Amino acid sequence: MIHIVDLPFAKTPQRLADVTFHEKPLRAKQTRFVGRSVLQPVLDLDNFNLKAVIDWIEIVVQLGKVTQFQHVQRKIEDELGQKCFIKAIGAGAGNASQTFSIRLQEPKSVAFVLEVERLLDVSFGMTAATTVNAIEFSVDAYPKIPSDRAREQLLGVMQRTIFSREDLYTNPNARPRLAWDNSSPKYIQPHRMHAYNERHYTAPKLDATMYLGAEADDVMLRLMDKIIDTQNKAEGTAVTLEPEKQRVRIEVTLQGSGLKRIGVATLADMKAMSFTRLQGEFFTFRLFTTPPRNQMLSQTKSGARYEDKINREIFLKAGVAGLLFKEHVRKSWRVNAKPLALLNLKNRGRRLKVLRDGVTAADQLIAYKGLNERVTRALRDLENRERRALKSLGV
């Protein structure tokens, strides 16, 4: 069975791309997947080169003397040639302090950040270990032959298969959403009363940035088609990247508990960090599985057939993010509404003989092995580059 999925644009609604999903038998040993089919994207991942980078890192340093931020900034920029954004913490008279947060954009390596730390230690002295306040990792996918269509299809697939372990629904600001230009974000999921109607879900737009998680969350994901750089939103200007530099990008910003999950608290912790761990924790992609159509037609319970049909349609339109919203609504109903229904039955002298959670939408998801493996490979390459840089520094 073939499913052709439309991939819409936000800024030019008349424009449309598409990608195909092939529904085919799944070969899996896990009991819950036996006899099921998988919706597999028709996309040759070998047509892309993936590269992982540290997009930026924010560290906090405690110096041995009181100074102003511009002196720290000048020292780093003049001697190491690294642009940085510095903020004094707990500043006193003359905006002077001993504690500063320093954000380094696109640092060459962790080893280079350690060089920054050494420079500040020599120049100002250090009274405590340098801590990591936040960090952003990116994985970029470049078509081997520059192509708008190749990027559009890969992004459309990523938007539908990205899987987040975070709670995206308790905090309304964390909900999966799309943003473009200066417009208000458009949420992927509908009002909860329409959770079982795929027509009320919003399909991700190819020329929008897709967010999972709030700006202030400890973990936030972003997906985009990166075709511009050095954007100035206030002036409405940007530089269009050359075709060979245009790529699909997925970013994860970590702070607080997000850093703790990868074992990072201090800058020194990053020397032994496992970069490949990021794939399993954050850069995770999953595919939807469904019973074969002949099995669906033979199911005696119409509810089960309806559930499978709706899940398939939501996945194809709004992806895993849409499915997990529907599951959130379903669980909310079980927690809040079902006890009242059971109490009502009890008061009427009746009872529900069997109470089961059943198979959830999350249970029907399986790892997108091909994409996950390529992301892991890109992260391993990053880890190897970092190890070489540390070795050259003598660390």
What are these regions (language model features)?
Residues 1-329, 347, 356-395:
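Structured, helix-rich domain cores that form ligand/interaction pockets
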Residues 330-343, 348:
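Membrane-inserting effector segments that mediate pore formation, membrane fusion
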